[in-house]
């Protein structure tokens, strides 16, 4: 394995042997989901008691229109919860998802968290665990990957964020409606990760464990190259209740329910 490839992947968190991290993603928090918000708060409170770090792998919010929307009813309670946990000594890190990729420095300062590159590493002793939101591995969805490249471009983001907040909300609503329509018509297989892309990441980054969200297909998958852990999405307001994540500590990776 080339050391150059390994050096290019940043380390998000280095845990000591006695430390523990809580990893969650895809909560899609919003003002019309009070029960899910309550479960999130309970999870953060548990992390303060039992963990040293909270790692959020994207899609914490249903969507993000810009850091000038921090006082919105859907966002302010979440920021307040994170800030209180950080003030209590919890290290909080956040990786962008496909819903909240516009969250920026002002959000990070308000919530007292650190923004992460995607992908990056969590290390604990000999353990090297790659963490990612997961959408970059869904390479069979060519249209989505094209869209992802466009909206992650700094120039596109600058132009979008220069528009009035109300207009941004309207544009996002339209994009979400189109996305839901496309997902309803597209083959379900392309919404999942591509096995060859996963194997390529195992090989090029020198890891044997990957943790990601995005697909809403929780589980543990073994391949000859390593183990892939898929985090659950969260839903406690409508439909079947679900939610949780994984703990990372000296004993390895353990899933938990919210």
Where are these regions (language model features)?
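Active-site metal-binding loops of divalent metal-dependent hydrolases
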Residues: 25-28, 59-60, 98-99, 134-136, ...
């Amino acid at each position: 394995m080339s050391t150059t490839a390994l050096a290019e992947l940043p380390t998000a968190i280095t845990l000591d042997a006695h430390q523990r991290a809580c990893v969650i993603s895809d909560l899609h928090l919003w003002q019309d989901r009070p029960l899910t918000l309550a479960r999130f708060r309970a999870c953060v409170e548990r992390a303060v008691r039992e963990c040293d770090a909270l790692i959020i792998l994207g899609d914490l919010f249903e969507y993000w229109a810009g850091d000038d929307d921090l006082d919105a009813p859907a966002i302010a309670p979440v920021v307040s919860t994170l800030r209180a946990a950080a003030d209590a000594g919890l290290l909080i890190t956040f990786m962008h998802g496909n819903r909240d990729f516009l969250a920026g420095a002002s959000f990070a300062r308000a919530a007292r968290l650190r923004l992460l590159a995607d992908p990056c590493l969590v290390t604990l002793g000999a353990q090297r665990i790659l963490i990612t939101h997961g959408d970059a591995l869904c390479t069979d969805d060519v249209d989505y990957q094209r869209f992802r490249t466009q909206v992650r471009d700094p120039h596109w983001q600058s132009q979008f964020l220069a528009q009035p907040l109300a207009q941004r909300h309207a544009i996002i609503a339209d994009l979400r409606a189109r996305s839901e329509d496309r997902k309803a018509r597209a083959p379900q297989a392309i919404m999942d990760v591509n096995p060859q892309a996963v194997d390529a990441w195992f090989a090029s980054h020198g890891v044997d464990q990957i943790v990601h969200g995005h697909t809403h297909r929780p589980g543990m998958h073994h391949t000859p190259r390593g183990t892939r852990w898929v985090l659950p999405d969260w839903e406690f307001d409508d439909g079947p209740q679900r939610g949780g994540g994984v703990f990372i500590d000296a004993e390895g990776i353990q899933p938990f329910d919210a």
